[in-house]
Structure formats: C-alpha cells, structure tokens
C-alpha cells in the first residue's frame, strides 16, 4: 500500500483490492494508517465504481463478540428521475475517506447537562423501539445506533421534514446542537471502550450526484463517516454486493448481509450505513465447568431446560425485591454494564409497557453492592426489522414520500427515504459476551462460619436487558428474552 501511495506500482494496483485490504486490516482504525490511506486515495482513482474484491484479507481471530448493530437508510429520487452517471465521482477528494470523530487525548470528555438530556431521550426512544419490535418474542435493538443514523440524516433535512424527523427520533436539542451532542456522546463511548468497540459510519452516493460540502462536512467532522460513490442507477445489484461486503467486514462476518437482492433500485441516490461492533469480557468470567441445564420458566406453569452459567459467589450491584430483581454484570474495568431486570409479579410484556427512561433511571439507583449467587442463561438474540412504519407513526411520514425536503444534501434532485433497516445481535457466554463452553455439574462453595449467605440472583424468567455505558449514560442495546433456548 505504501508503494502504491508513492506512485511506484499504480499500474499494477487494483483500487478496489486496496480498498478491501484497507477495511479488513486490523490497523485501519489507527489515525496514522487512515492518514496514509487518505493521502493516496485520489491517486488510486475512483474507489467506489467496482465491486470490492472477494479476498479474505487480514482478519482478527482473537476478538470476543458482545453484539452488533447495523442500520441502513436508503434515499431514492422521489421525482422518479435519474441522473446520468459520470465516469468519475464528483465527491470532493477530501471526503473520499472518512475521518474519525473520536478525537484524541487520554482524558474522557465529560458529558454536558444538555448531552445527558439527549442521552436520556435516546434511552426512551430505544425502549419505545423495542416495544414495537417482535412483541412477545426475543428481540434486541440498538437505540444508540438508530439515533446516530437519524442524526446523520437530519443534517440534510430541512423544513417540516427536519421537524418531523427530530420529533420521531426524540431529539430534545435544537438542530444547531444535535450534531455536537452525538459527536460528544460517541467520543465518550469510544474512548471508554477503546479496544472493545468499533463504530463505523458510511454514506454511499450515486455517481454523478454532487452532494453539498456543508452536508459532507458535518458527516465527516461530527460522525467520522466515509463517503463513497456507487452506481445505483446502472448496477443496483453491484451496489447491494458492495454494501453487504462493507457490512460483513465491519461486523467481522457476523452479519454477512443486510440487503436482499432487489433492495436497492435504479432510482436510489443515497444510502447511509452504520455498524457498531462490541467485544468485551466479564470482569469475572463464569467457570464453564459449573454450567448446567436448569429450568427457565416461560410462564408460571411452563418451563424449559436451558443451559445456565453459575457463579456461587460474586460481588455485584443488584436489587432483590418481591416484585423485581435487577442484576448488574460488569466487563473488565467496569467499562460496560449489562443490566438484567426480571419482573416477578407481572408479565414481561406488562413490565416493558410500563418502562420509560425516567423509570429505568430510578430503578438503577436502587441497586446496591452485594454478594450474590448468580444463575444466568446463555443466550443469543437477533432482530432484523424495518423502521419505516415505526417512524411514520411518530411524525416522520414526510421524509418517506414526495413531500420530503432533503435540500441540505443536494439541489440536483428531490430525495426521500425509501426505508430504514435495523439489525442487531447480542450473544452472552461464560467468558464474556460470547464463547462456547462445556457444561458439567456445578461445584458448591461452602459458606464460612458467621458470614451471611449470598443473595440468590436467579435470572430464570422472561427478562429485560440493557447494555449500558455508564460514563455517558448511554444504552447501547436494549432487549428482551422470553425463551433463551430459542
């Protein structure tokens, strides 16, 4: 790559292969590496016109996966007209490769009061989104990633379209502050979870369409978004393959595809993508030799044997009450908390309907440090859904039809959003939030004389869970598990 950048072997360099290598290289998120690649992007020509190479590239094999979210928004020309593709991209060179909005420095930025207000609103939005996802079944969503994507989209929205989008997304800050707020929250999350989290944003634009510098500048500086040209008009299938390839690389192959064949149309002009990859281990891993099948109660009179992870004595934060149990499990260094809420006197559906950001915040304050015997089921939860109906019902209907105003993106054609797809996956295992383990009879630790027995925290009924970054007070994922064996 260095040789190519110096111009010594450009004649033998396939640009799409270099781009593939760049995205698959484990070092590609390092600022110095990104700077080198950015400096030679224009010399490699139009990086987005050809499908990415299918080489396996360099892949990290040591990561443990906690969860992934990927969201895709697709904008099409609402006037039905298409623009003639040009042989080369009109995207300015300086926007050819995204630059990180993470910032630098060893100190964590402290969220300002207005940013905490937006984080609280994001939590309320996430809970509402979960309520509208696969009711009564296992489900998981990343409200944070959805909110981030909608904030990116809002950078190009104007008039009633911008107002409706902000209302539906529960943005509590004015447009002039919303991008700074999300940049700041993203910085806190990324710096806190450095080495455990990868956050990637990209915008894919029809070749020949000239986006406004102001729009691209917001996406580049506030969201670190890469901007790439694609030929939706003449090769929508190739565009699907390219975006799916990006998806697979950003999610380390866990989500190999988000777009089905035919999902992109010749009328498509812009696609926004966002991927969140988390890798974290428990502060104290569960001993796999103690894991065993136990009953998980699907209802008061029906149960199913399910693999459970068991720790006979663990220091936790928890709330044990007649009506509700809450358990906090931390990753190494306390950087991330997975919070489990188990209602005992009402159904999970009823409990979920009563949840709000304010109630969750109040419940979290009631948890106290304690010693506990923990029984937690192993589980994997995955959800894939369209957000179009959800956002329409909440006031954002104009952005999906010919009333949409996205003149902040371009004046060359009328744009509207075709659909927004959201996919999320979370795995919980003994070592952290992944990894397989054998099961065997548990070993019981005897209680020393005079010491009270640990509180039993048994997550053996349908439960609500939340993956929480405490420094920014951001819910990265919220979900429900009604049957961990399903």
Positions of the model-derived regions?
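Serine residues within intrinsically disordered or low-complexity segments
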Residues: 28, 35-42, 60-63, 82
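Non-catalytic, conformational "gating/processing" segments within enzyme and secreted inhibitor domains
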Residues: 136, 175-344, 361, 365-453
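Short, low-complexity, charge-dense intrinsically disordered segments
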Residues: 10, 27, 38-45, 51
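Detector for small/aliphatic-rich hydrophobic stretches
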Residues: 19, 54, 62, 66-73, ...
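Aromatic (phenylalanine/tyrosine) cluster motif
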Residues: 22-23, 33, 37
């Amino acid at each position: 790559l260095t040789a190519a950048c110096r111009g010594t072997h450009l004649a033998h360099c396939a640009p799409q292969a270099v781009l593939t290598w760049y995205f698959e290289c484990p070092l590609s998120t390092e600022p110095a590496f990104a700077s080198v690649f950015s400096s030679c992007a224009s010399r490699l020509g139009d990086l987005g016109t050809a499908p990415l190479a299918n080489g396996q590239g360099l892949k990290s094999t040591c990561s443990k996966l906690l969860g992934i979210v990927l969201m895709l928004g697709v904008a099409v020309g609402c006037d039905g007209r298409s623009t003639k593709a040009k042989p080369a991209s009109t995207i300015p060179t300086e926007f050819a490769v995204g630059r990180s909005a993470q910032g630098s420095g060893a100190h964590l930025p402290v969220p300002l009061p207005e940013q905490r207000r937006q984080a609280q609103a994001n939590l309320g939005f996430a809970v509402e989104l979960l309520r509208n996802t696969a009711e009564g079944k296992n489900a998981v969503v990343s409200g944070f990633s959805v909110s981030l994507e909608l904030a990116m989209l809002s950078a190009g929205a104007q008039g009633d379209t911008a107002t409706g989008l902000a209302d539906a997304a529960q943005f509590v800050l004015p447009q002039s502050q919303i991008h700074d707020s999300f940049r700041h929250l993203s910085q806190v999350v990324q710096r806190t979870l450095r080495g455990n989290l990868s956050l990637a944003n990209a915008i894919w634009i029809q070749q020949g369409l000239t986006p406004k510098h102001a729009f691209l500048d917001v996406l580049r500086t506030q969201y670190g978004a890469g901007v790439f040209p694609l030929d939706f008009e003449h090769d929508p299938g190739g565009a699907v393959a390219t975006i799916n390839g990006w998806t697979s690389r950003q999610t380390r192959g866990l989500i190999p595809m988000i777009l089905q064949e035919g999902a992109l149309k010749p009328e498509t002009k812009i696609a926004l993508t966002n991927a969140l990859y988390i890798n974290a281990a428990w502060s104290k891993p569960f001993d796999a030799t103690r894991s065993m099948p136990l009953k998980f109660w699907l209802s008061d009179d029906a149960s199913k044997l399910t693999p459970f992870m068991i720790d006979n004595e663990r220091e936790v934060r928890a709330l044990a009450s007649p009506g509700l149990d809450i358990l906090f499990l931390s990753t190494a260094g306390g950087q991330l908390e997975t919070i489990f809420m188990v209602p005992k006197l009402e159904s999970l559906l009823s409990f979920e309907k009563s949840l709000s950001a304010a109630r969750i915040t109040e419940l979290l304050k009631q948890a106290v440090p304690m010693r506990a015997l923990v029984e937690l089921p192993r589980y994997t939860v995955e959800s894939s859904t369209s957000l179009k109906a959800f956002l329409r019902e909440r006031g954002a209907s104009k952005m999906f039809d010919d009333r949409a105003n996205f003149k902040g993106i371009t004046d060359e054609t009328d744009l509207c959003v075709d659909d927004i797809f959201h996919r999320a996956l979370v795995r919980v295992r003994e070592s952290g939030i992944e990894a397989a383990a054998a099961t065997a009879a548990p070993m019981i630790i005897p209680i020393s004389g005079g010491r009270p027995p640990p509180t039993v925290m048994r997550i053996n009924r349908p439960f609500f869970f939340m993956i929480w970054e405490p420094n920014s007070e951001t819910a990265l994922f919220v979900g429900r598990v009604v049957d961990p064996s399903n």
